[in-house]
Amino acid sequence: MSRFKVSKFRHMEARPSRREAWISDIRAVTTPTCGNHIKSSCSLIAFNSDRPGVLGVISLEGHEENKRHVTYLGCHSDLVTDLDFSPFDDFLLASGSADRTIKLWRLSGTGEALPSVPGVVLGPEELPVEVLQFHPTVDGVLVSTAGKTVKVWDVAKQQPLTELEAHKDLVQSAVWSRDGAIVGTACKDKQLRIFDPRARTQASQSTQAHENNRDIRLAWTGIQEHLVSTGFNQMREREAKLWDTRLFSSALASVTLDTSPGPLIPLLDPDSGLLVLAGKGENQLYCYEVTPQQPALSPVTQCILENVLRGAALVPRRALAVMSCEVLQVLQLSDTAIIPISHHVPRKAVEFHEDLFPDTAGSVPASDAHMWWAGDNQQVQKVSLNPARRPHPCFTSSLVPTMEPAPDMVQPAEMPRADTDLSEGFSSPSSLMSPSTPSSLGPSLSSTSGIGTSPSQRSLQSLLGPSSKFRHTQGSLLHRDSHITNLKGLNLTTPGESDGFCANRLRVAVPLLSSGGQVAVLELQKPGRLPDTALPTLQNGTAVMDLVWDPFDPHRLAVAGEDARIRLWRVPPGGLENVLTTPETVLTGHTEKIYSLRFHPLAADVLASSSYDLTVRIWDLQTGAERLKLQGHQDQIFSLAWSPDGKQLATVCKDGHVRVYEPRSSPLPLQEGPGPEGGRGARIVWVCDGGCLLVSGFDSRSERQLQLYIADALAQGPSALLGLDVAPSTLLPSYDPDTGLVLLTGKGDTRVFLYEVLPEAPFFLECNSFTSPDPHKGFVLLPKTECDIQDVEFARCLRLRQTSLEPVAFRLPRVRKEFFQDDVFPDTAVTWEPALSAKAWFEGANGQPRLLSLQPPGMTPVSQAPREVPARRAPSSAQYLEEKSDQQKKEELLNAMVAKLGNREDPLPQDSFEGVDEDEWD
């Protein structure tokens, strides 16, 4: 632009919309990622919610008669780092995550259910995915970054076309040029690089971008050779630079803003050349006009925001209100709302202005991935934004097929009410199988899932695959009044084989760091702040290795010591009031320190212990004698677990084997199979009514993983593998046999994974995880009787922090809570009453636990509840008006105006005035 030529945007105004147009009642969160946290197509908005791995989805266009409601899409098992809509298909969304995968989702229109499984999964990568972007001219191509790696994907084949090399540090930005021929990247090594991915994997050009390596972002202008970068200089000032790839040694122009720490998000509209700079954590937007011809970054306007900005996105140009001269619309993501910010150029005439709205790229791709990779450079056909001439082609990408529900799905009376969730909707991510999972495992629903399906539901499941009815699980901390606070001197260095603390329905036992192996006993019925004085303890005289409560006697605690002894303590019914130094019983027999203790699930006074002497010993607590000794381990025993019927005992060992024993039959293992490869630790638990074994451990790359075994076929190896994440602590599984859910977390973690475990494919159904703001030191599951059944609380846990003990409730959102949810709460086993004595069990007897109904008095099961008849909705006034002709609308408008003016035959006020004589005018 010549310096004597004025800009057509010089009078542009940026105004946040009225509160009525805000999308309120959301909960957003900012994560330390390179993404913008919000994206928009011409139909939908997607944004990061405050739940890890969950995106909020809402319609872009609001309707006056209906308030827009946010639906939630459970995408990943970890934070969503970036997301992008297809430039051609408004309902095709790609999401990248810290779980190292990229997923493509076929979203639906307003009011329709979101998918529960992705249409396409790319990866997993070696590191978390940081950035992704669809190709601007081709359907089925996208670029992504993970660590130092940049890949260009053929989505249809689910394979990378190429991998761009030469990056020496974390890649913070990767963007396509407008014609889709080249890719620009910004790296933490301060370098900007230009790639032609179809020609070579090495960068064709590179230059130093900014002097500081913090959060460098890129955006291409409408001219292929020019791009904009944002970052920080050596003085930690935020700056934006304009680059020409033909003269890449230095920037053409630059502008410096301030020293605010929030990284700048560059939002550039290539058609108008307008650049909006939005700072995370700030309350101001800067708008510049990019003029490469001069060259310059010319300031146009600024906008003060009412709320702090957490993310920002541009609304596509085809969705702007062109008749009101809206040249730009920014969506501001705040903590509790999405706020549209319109940029208008004031004009007198209400008409389409060609100078403000040149033709823009349409919604039909120019080619496909195969043609583009072969060298095709066709460009997307441009379309006019003039409403009178604007075409309305509807392109639907074939990458993810659309879901066409069966006709009977639209009949509400046909749908069962037992598994109905909240109307706002919430979709759960699918479980990702490890690459080593057998390929023959096809998706199918287990009969144990407890979901009654109609033919219409089965036809939908054939498209989406199975999903858990617990996928909408909501975990939350209970009120602070139920917390135990002011904990001091906790022992946080208990062995990895121990849970760190133990709890029953009455009290909690926590090892302390003080000498003498002291254990504090806290009463759950007495929450609040503990006194600053020393607590009464159980003094073991040696370091505590593990501890566990007797399931049939809530006052008896078993403690394993480093001195190879097991001490049994009796806690008074009112709680521990004095220091106890003498245990009720001491069990001796192991020759090395003990690692794990497990009480028998059905027989009273039967205890199993594992030791570093490579044996498992089973004790009769009535006589205080060792009765059985199991052998066959070649290395440290990581974990042991009784089967639900108490007949067998399983172990996982550092020698890389899983073993199953029948203790009363033989001291040697009945079965043996391969276990986790890593030797850092493992846990084992019986699942699926004792038909399967679940082992949590590590692979050879130190990735935490789950292995599911058929209990009768250990030698065949695991039936399924599930890789989770990379972390140092072993995942501690807590299994709920009533729901089939396993809760997994590690010491020092902030997240609790939830999976429904099935004995057949797909074996693992992922549910919403629970995330806490700070790490916990332990996490244990309480008995089912502690749950609030009327609030559909199916699990309650205790979370041990460094200074407090907090209860966590896991609930399932349901619409009709006035009914007993019998599909969620089957009859539960009475685990606090023994089924037989120790003597009977050692003599070969077996027992079964008594079952107890959890149905509260006076509540009707939801399976017997009357079905709701959907109310017929009357057509809205807007629909009624659309059916009228223009002439009818005109007549109604005139009649309404006349009715307001009153009767036209009434005399006018001036008719009653007295006139003047003619001669008075002179």
UniProtKB/Swiss-Prot annotation:
PTM info: The membrane-associated form is phosphorylated on tyrosine residues.
GO biological process: actin filament organization; actin filament polymerization; cell migration; establishment of cell polarity; Golgi organization; Golgi to endosome transport; positive regulation of hippo signaling; protein transport
InterPro entries assigned to the protein according to its UniProt record, in alphabetical order: Coronin, DUF1899, G-protein_beta_WD-40_rep, Quinoprotein_ADH-like_sf, WD40/YVTN_repeat-like_dom_sf, WD40_repeat_CS, WD40_rpt
Tissues expressing this chain: In the adult, widely expressed with highest levels in brain, thymus and kidney and low levels in skeletal and heart muscle. Not expressed in lung. In the eye, strongly expressed in the outer plexiform layer of the retina. In the intestine, expressed both in terminally differentiated epithelial cells and in crypt epithelium. In the embryo, strongest expression is seen in brain, thymus, intestine, apical epidermal layers of the skin and developing lens fibers of the eye.
Record field: compositional bias (Low complexity): 427-456
A GO term from the CC aspect: Golgi membrane
Domain of life from the UniProt record: Eukaryota
Annotated stretches, region: Disordered: 419-467, 858-922
One Pfam family from the record: WD40_4
Bias-annotated ranges (Basic and acidic residues): 881-893
MF-aspect GO terms: actin binding
Entry-annotated residues carrying Phosphoserine: S459, S462, S912
WD repeats: 75-115, 124-163, 166-205, 209-253, 539-581, 589-629, 632-671, 725-765
Predominant subcellular localization, coarse grouping: Golgi
UniProt keyword list: Actin-binding, Cytoplasm, Cytoplasmic vesicle, Golgi apparatus, Isopeptide bond, Membrane, Phosphoprotein, Protein transport, Repeat, Transport, Ubl conjugation, WD repeat
Subcellular location: Golgi apparatus membrane; Golgi apparatus, trans-Golgi network; Cytoplasmic vesicle; Cytoplasm, Cytosol
Cross-link position per record: Glycyl lysine isopeptide (Lys-Gly) (interchain with G-Cter in ubiquitin): K469
Subunit structure: Interacts with clathrin adapter AP1 complex. This interaction takes place at Golgi membranes and not AP1-positive endosomal membranes. Interacts (when ubiquitinated at Lys-469) with EPS15.
Family as reported in the entry's similarity comment: Belongs to the WD repeat coronin family.
Function of the protein: F-actin regulator involved in anterograde Golgi to endosome transport: upon ubiquitination via 'Lys-33'-linked ubiquitin chains by the BCR(KLHL20) E3 ubiquitin ligase complex, interacts with EPS15 and localizes to the trans-Golgi network, where it promotes actin polymerization, thereby facilitating post-Golgi trafficking. May play a role in the maintenance of the Golgi apparatus morphology.
Protein name: Coronin-7
Chain's gene name: Coro7
